[in-house]
A protein has these predicted regions:
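Histidine- and aromatic-enriched segments that form or immediately flank copper-ligand environments
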Residues: 36
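A conserved hydrophobic secondary-structure block that centers on an alpha-helix together
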Residues: 203-211, 215, 219-220, 299-303
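Carbohydrate-binding surfaces of carbohydrate-active enzymes
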Residues: 2, 6-28, 39-46, 52-90, ...
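Acidic/aromatic-lined carbohydrate-recognition and catalytic surfaces
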Residues: 43-159, 165-169, 173-206
Length: 671
């Protein structure tokens, strides 16, 4: 523990403001931000509404950068004055409309008697047909759909038409491309209703770099080398629908014109004859096919977007961070990116946002996914964009306490930077310069918040949560189940959201009762990259075959393996009963917390540096009985206390304490 950092008055590791629009008086603005205890800002080229990056506004941005440099204020660069990142102030698609996001949908025609011949013509909302094929169904089975996908016949087609001739027992599938737009995040994002770029097309991202980032490098060469990091904001594939209450005519999977050839080159087989299995489960090969497909999609998004922008920024002396869409649920990790973890890992510094900013309504697993990614990348933690969006009126009713609570949770789970959209009352500093900033945190609250997170960083910075109990991040199960919907109602299906629902239950039962877990994925288990005492597999239908073998190895080494509800089968269809045991979350809790029981709603996270973070999510003070002698760091009060074994301490609500186990000889009164 570095007591200089604990006691130091500096602004390092305090919160940053998301500051998009600067007043003319830059010095007064910087003075105010510093006076409220904040560290720095996330800012951008001052593009007017509906405008684009130009030499003139880059010149203005250069003046801002020079002033920030002169005043010693750290800054991040927000990659565009617009949202979501990637459309380049709407310039990319204005130049190249062919680079818009695309989706592939299926039309199916089957015949059980007689013969039928017709021409199918696509509708006016669609672009073109890209594949059509006919298969034979076994009509002797009057219960199930038994289709011979190995004996398919490709059908000739034009851009808009295909002639289909069916005999009894034949099925035709037609695969059609259209814009991924209606009902997507394109039209439900609070910023614009413009179409978005195709993340499967590397040229689309190159065009974004040309439109938005290259002008900064040319007109303000110091900007990228000086900035902390570049902040990108929620790019996505746009093929999933955003609202559960809307329905559309097309269930879409991600598509680009190069997709079939690239898939074949990477996975070693032709995707096209098996395309129906991305939409329906009429052959047991659907599980492996979908895992291969969504893994491929994740690879391409990671390379084209995060990887390409990161590589370009490295050439400018900068790094990529920011955050991506829908961190909270694994099913959205698949629908929005194919493989969310791979995409985030391809940036330099992982990040997330938090829109539910109430300790009573918190997505507890979301920061834990980022903690896993941070561990994999070897970063000191991750960034959080703090944005009270949902239930804002409840947040505002007690904003300071809610902010302190969320900061406690986030830092406990590994966050090391907070960039906030919840602003302080800078109008109190200078009403002429900040006429619109009369709401938010007061100066006293801002100073207290910033001192709080700086002291937490002094204790936990440079370390990470320990992986003693591991929760399996079962992406393969979600991939294997993934089929496109005509609505954003995935979460309403207990089958598609089985893993997410199970993880929510574990957060409620384990985390809220003092038993921490950290996520580990197939790569971690197969590679032996974690050394836990227990592995929990949440409720699921499938695990990767390699994961099954890894679980057997871990159990042979003495690690406890728990399955939830029942044992799954492997993606290849293997059933197994020779590893682990089946039990529920309550039974896992009883076993994993041993003899030590914390009060309900007290969260405990051990760290690899020997520290233990303890957070009280109760609305009142909670009495803790100290098990072992410990030094206790209270980052809100700024106090350090020695507590003996068996001593009791009252912990305030919504606060984090850090415990450091000490030996008796360290007690100056001992002996």
């Amino acid at each position: 523990m570095d007591m200089k950092k604990w006691n130091g008055p500096g602004r390092a590791h305090a919160v940053n403001l998301m500051f998009h629009n600067w007043p003319k008086d830059l010095d007064t603005a910087i003075d105010a931000i510093f006076d409220f205890g904040f560290s720095g800002v996330v800012t951008n080229v001052p593009v007017p509404k509906g405008g684009r990056v130009t030499r003139e506004n880059v010149r203005e941005f250069s003046g801002i950068v020079q002033k920030l440099k002169e005043r010693g204020m750290p800054f991040w660069i927000y990659d565009e004055k617009g949202y979501p990142s990637g459309h380049g102030c709407h310039q990319v698609l204005a130049r190249r409309p062919d680079l818009a996001a695309k989706g592939l949908y299926m039309r199916k025609f089957e015949l059980f008697s007689g013969e039928k011949s017709f021409v199918y013509t696509i509708d006016g909302m669609s672009d073109k047909i890209v594949y059509a094929a006919k298969y034979v169904q076994n009509l002797s089975d009057v219960t199930e759909a038994v289709i011979d996908f190995d004996g398919g016949e490709a059908l000739p087609f034009t851009r808009r038409r295909v002639r289909i001739s069916l005999r009894a027992g034949e099925i035709a599938y037609v695969f059609i491309v259209k814009d991924a737009y209606e009902g997507s995040h394109c039209v439900h994002n609070c910023a614009s209703r413009e179409k978005y770029i195709n993340l499967l097309e590397p040229e689309a991202v190159r065009e974004f770099i040309r439109c938005n980032l290259e002008p900064i490098a040319e007109g303000c060469p110091e900007a990228f080398p000086l900035c902390e990091r570049v902040f990108t904001d929620e790019p996505s594939l746009m093929t999933a629908y955003a609202r559960w209450y809307e329905s559309f005519n097309y269930a879409l999977i991600p598509y680009s014109d190069k997709m079939f050839g690239e898939f074949s080159a990477r996975k070693g087989y032709d995707l096209r004859p098996l395309l129906p299995l991305l939409f329906e489960s009429t052959d047991e090969r659907y599980k492996k096919l979908r895992v291969d497909f969504y893994s491929f999609i994740g690879e391409r998004v990671a390379e084209n977007y995060s990887g390409q922008i990161s590589a370009w920024l490295h050439g400018q002396g900068a790094e990529l961070s920011g955050h991506y869409l829908a961190e909270e649920n694994i099913y959205q990790h698949v629908t929005e990116y194919g493989d969310y973890v791979r995409v985030v890992r391809s940036a330099d510094y992982p990040g997330m946002d938090i829109l539910y900013t109430l300790p009573t309504d918190f997505f507890w697993n979301a920061p834990k996914y980022l903690s896993m990614i941070s561990r994999k990348k070897g970063t000191d933690g991750f960034m959080v964009e703090f944005c009270p969006f949902y239930k804002r009126e409840i947040f505002d009713a007690n904003a300071f306490e809610n902010f302190m609570a969320c900061a406690s949770i986030l830092y406990m789970y590994g966050a090391r930077v907070i960039n906030t959209y919840f602003m302080p009352r800078l109008k109190d500093y200078n009403a002429e310069v900040f006429p619109d900033f009369g709401w938010g945190l007061t100066r006293e609250e801002s100073l207290r918040l910033n001192a709080y997170v700086r002291r937490i960083y002094a204790c936990l910075g440079g370390s990470r949560p320990a992986c003693r109990t591991v929760m399996y991040y079962n992406l393969e199960d979600v991939m294997a189940k993934a089929v496109p919907h005509i609505s954003g109602d995935y979460f309403m299906s207990s089958y598609y959201s089985q893993t997410d629902n199970s993880l929510t239950e574990y957060a409620r039962v384990l985390l809220a009762n003092g038993v921490n877990y950290e996520f580990a994925d197939r790569e971690d288990l197969v590679g032996g990259k974690v050394s836990p005492r227990a592995i929990i597999v949440p409720a699921c239908a499938f695990v990767a075959d390699e994961t099954y073998e890894a679980l057997k190895r871990y159990e042979a080494e003495g690690v406890k393996v728990y399955f939830t509800g029942r044992r799954p089968q492997t993606v290849s269809g293997r059933a197994f009963s020779d590893v682990g045991e089946v039990c529920g979350a309550a039974e896992v809790l009883a076993r994993e917390r041993g003899g030590q029981a914390f009060p309900e709603n007290v969260y405990v996270t051990p760290y690899v540096n020997g520290m233990t973070a303890v957070y009280n999510n109760n609305t009142d003070k909670t009495c803790l009985c100290i098990g072992d002698r410990a030094r206790v760091y209270d980052p809100d009060a700024g106090e350090v206390r020695e507590l003996r074994a068996g001593e009791k301490a009252e912990m305030p609500p919504y606060r984090l304490w850090i415990f450091e186990k000490t030996a008796d000889e360290e007690d100056p009164s001992a002996g």
